[in-house]
Amino acid sequence: MRLILLGPPGAGKGTQAAHICEAFGIPQISTGDMLRAAVKAGTPLGQQAKKIMDEGGLVSDDIILGLIEERVAQADCANGFLFDGFPRTIAQADGLNDQGIRIDAVVEIQVPDEEIVDRMAGRRVHPGSGRVYHVTHNPPRQEGKDDVTGEDLVQREDDREETVRHRLGVYHEQTRPLVDYYSQWAQKGGADAPAYITVDGQRPVETVRDEILAALKAR
């Protein structure tokens, strides 16, 4: 099962990816992890990427696609894989096709922007333990204090409303077009066309998980 998971930041993709990978016995492939591993291993592509990153540049699609091609050829991908955070752009999706890497299904987790903002901007964290609360959905017993230690809770920079809205803006501009790209391809059909599965991500994690797994197993 070769899969792509789409959805805005905060939609719960990481949680669902773990469930999918466990159910199908496939690895979760993150471009960030892949880059770090290639740099650490000192591969030719890793050395190119390190030079660019050291200079503060963005690693090109050609290098990313080269790393993807190497990664999916490894033994643990024999039964498939799940791409996490890839492709991010139409150009990367086209590159994947050009390499002949076939995708069986694309799963889109749908969550409205305002729900994402509420989820993320309401998070509060205890720095010492990593315990996470939510001002509405999972509040601490005493406002702003950790239940166990009584120490102050903080809002992470990534969870501030302006940061969340900026990330959503980037998603809609760069990654959201992939929804049209893959859903239209699935509608047209053809031998290589992936299935396109949409799920409502506003429901409980277990409900979303069960619906995704049922849809994938029904293929």
UniProtKB/Swiss-Prot annotation:
<dbReference type="InterPro" id="IPR027417">
    <property type="entry name" value="P-loop_NTPase"/>
</dbReference>
<feature type="binding site">
    <location>
        <begin position="57"/>
        <end position="59"/>
    </location>
    <ligand>
        <name>AMP</name>
    </ligand>
</feature>
<dbReference type="Pfam" id="PF00406">
    <property type="entry name" value="ADK"/>
</dbReference>
<dbReference type="GO" id="GO:0004017">
    <property type="term" value="F:adenylate kinase activity"/>
</dbReference>
<feature type="compositionally biased region" description="Basic and acidic residues">
    <location>
        <begin position="140"/>
        <end position="150"/>
    </location>
</feature>
<comment type="similarity">
    <text>Belongs to the adenylate kinase family.</text>
</comment>
<dbReference type="InterPro" id="IPR007862">
    <property type="entry name" value="Adenylate_kinase_lid-dom"/>
</dbReference>
<keyword id="KW-0067">ATP-binding</keyword>
<dbReference type="Pfam" id="PF05191">
    <property type="entry name" value="ADK_lid"/>
</dbReference>
<keyword id="KW-0418">Kinase</keyword>
<protein>
    <recommendedName>
        <fullName>Adenylate kinase</fullName>
        <ecNumber>2.7.4.3</ecNumber>
    </recommendedName>
</protein>
<feature type="binding site">
    <location>
        <position position="203"/>
    </location>
    <ligand>
        <name>ATP</name>
    </ligand>
</feature>
<feature type="region of interest" description="LID">
    <location>
        <begin position="122"/>
        <end position="159"/>
    </location>
</feature>
<feature type="binding site">
    <location>
        <begin position="85"/>
        <end position="88"/>
    </location>
    <ligand>
        <name>AMP</name>
    </ligand>
</feature>
<feature type="binding site">
    <location>
        <position position="156"/>
    </location>
    <ligand>
        <name>AMP</name>
    </ligand>
</feature>
<feature type="binding site">
    <location>
        <begin position="132"/>
        <end position="133"/>
    </location>
    <ligand>
        <name>ATP</name>
    </ligand>
</feature>
<feature type="binding site">
    <location>
        <position position="92"/>
    </location>
    <ligand>
        <name>AMP</name>
    </ligand>
</feature>
<dbReference type="InterPro" id="IPR000850">
    <property type="entry name" value="Adenylat/UMP-CMP_kin"/>
</dbReference>
<feature type="binding site">
    <location>
        <position position="31"/>
    </location>
    <ligand>
        <name>AMP</name>
    </ligand>
</feature>
<dbReference type="InterPro" id="IPR033690">
    <property type="entry name" value="Adenylat_kinase_CS"/>
</dbReference>
<feature type="binding site">
    <location>
        <position position="167"/>
    </location>
    <ligand>
        <name>AMP</name>
    </ligand>
</feature>
<comment type="pathway">
    <text>Purine metabolism; AMP biosynthesis via salvage pathway; AMP from ADP: step 1/1.</text>
</comment>
<comment type="subunit">
    <text>Monomer.</text>
</comment>
<feature type="binding site">
    <location>
        <begin position="10"/>
        <end position="15"/>
    </location>
    <ligand>
        <name>ATP</name>
    </ligand>
</feature>
<dbReference type="InterPro" id="IPR006259">
    <property type="entry name" value="Adenyl_kin_sub"/>
</dbReference>
<feature type="binding site">
    <location>
        <position position="123"/>
    </location>
    <ligand>
        <name>ATP</name>
    </ligand>
</feature>
<feature type="region of interest" description="NMP">
    <location>
        <begin position="30"/>
        <end position="59"/>
    </location>
</feature>
<dbReference type="GO" id="GO:0005524">
    <property type="term" value="F:ATP binding"/>
</dbReference>
<comment type="function">
    <text>Catalyzes the reversible transfer of the terminal phosphate group between ATP and AMP. Plays an important role in cellular energy homeostasis and in adenine nucleotide metabolism.</text>
</comment>
<keyword id="KW-0963">Cytoplasm</keyword>
<keyword id="KW-0545">Nucleotide biosynthesis</keyword>
<dbReference type="GO" id="GO:0005737">
    <property type="term" value="C:cytoplasm"/>
</dbReference>
<feature type="binding site">
    <location>
        <position position="36"/>
    </location>
    <ligand>
        <name>AMP</name>
    </ligand>
</feature>
<keyword id="KW-0547">Nucleotide-binding</keyword>
<dbReference type="GO" id="GO:0044209">
    <property type="term" value="P:AMP salvage"/>
</dbReference>
<feature type="region of interest" description="Disordered">
    <location>
        <begin position="128"/>
        <end position="150"/>
    </location>
</feature>
<keyword id="KW-0808">Transferase</keyword>
